């Protein structure tokens, strides 16, 4: 009696499953990396929006700081910006700052990524990314 040899051996199936697992792992790493880049781009755009709003506020008022605008949440109400992770808005207080306005601290809920704008630089996690003209002076 002859048996036909149709199908795959167990070793062949295990090799295929291992290859699929490796490809899935690589795809997942690339996907999460792209997600983080997109979130960072949103936060940078939000920081630019805040810069524009604060400069407009300083041009419209006689105040040299924007404490009220930042502290009471009206800045975020005016801009409609949000943190891509859905976390709370966090802002630095500008009390006591003369001349240069130190404005934005945006933090993700996990607390691992943050972007800061001050009068001299735009930074991510404390490292300079590029300089910006947020030195809105009265």
Q: Where do the protein language model's features map onto the residues?
A:
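Generic cytosolic/nucleocytoplasmic N-terminal low-complexity/intrinsically disordered segments
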Residues: 4-5, 43-45, 77, 91
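N-terminal single-pass transmembrane signal-anchor helix
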Residues: 3-31
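Generic low-polarity alpha-helical segments
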Residues: 1, 43, 116-119
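Periplasmic/extracellular, small/polar-rich flexible segments of pilin-like filament-forming proteins
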Residues: 56-138
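Glycine-centered flexibility motif
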Residues: 15, 33, 82-86
